[in-house]
Amino acid sequence: MYINDEDLAKLVAVQVAEMDKKNKVCDAKNDYSRRLDKITNGLNDAEGIKLNFKVYLTKEYNAFACPDGSVRVYSALMDILSDDELLGVIGHEIGHVALRHSKKAWRSALLRSAVSDAIASQSRTWACLSDSQLGDITSLALSAKHSRYHETQADEFGYIFLKRCNKNPWAMGLALTKLKKMLNQKDISKYAKLLEAFSSHPNFDERIEHIKQLAERDNYKAK
């Protein structure tokens, strides 16, 4: 079953809107929103996909980007990362969108779900799906683990992303170092979503070393 980009974007947009309703979204005057606006100022699109940013006020640590261009950052993550480190993480997530990894994850989630036959039998429209079915697809897509190659690509995208924003790209390595430290916490439950997304192979040490090599190659200070 083939799902075109337009239909997929519509599905994702609807599901992101549902997630926005279920989470506490910071309003425009909130300090977190103002900080994110400042950090992402001028970031309008990724490979032609229009971006939109919001902050979820929560004690959980996470950030994700979806194929429709929606980028969501959790306030707790903002508390532990510097502006440049956060921009690197955002760049990594946008990389998955720009490089079409996210689209593959959503398509895979649909095909893995029990509703693919139902969609195919109704001219591949989303109208036949229940809220719970759509929710299952969303959960599968957002929890999908990317391949080693895709994670490396996204890390490199985040690195280049920082360079294009005139930032020291080693901030990507510093962000990964902080995420690695989370694994050593006694209670990692509040980090679960973020670590699930970021701790897939290659491991943190390999990823940090790769970014360090890129930074040293480009004459940026890596410390």
Describe each model-derived feature in a short phrase.
Residues 1-223:
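A Zn2+-metalloprotease active-site environment signal
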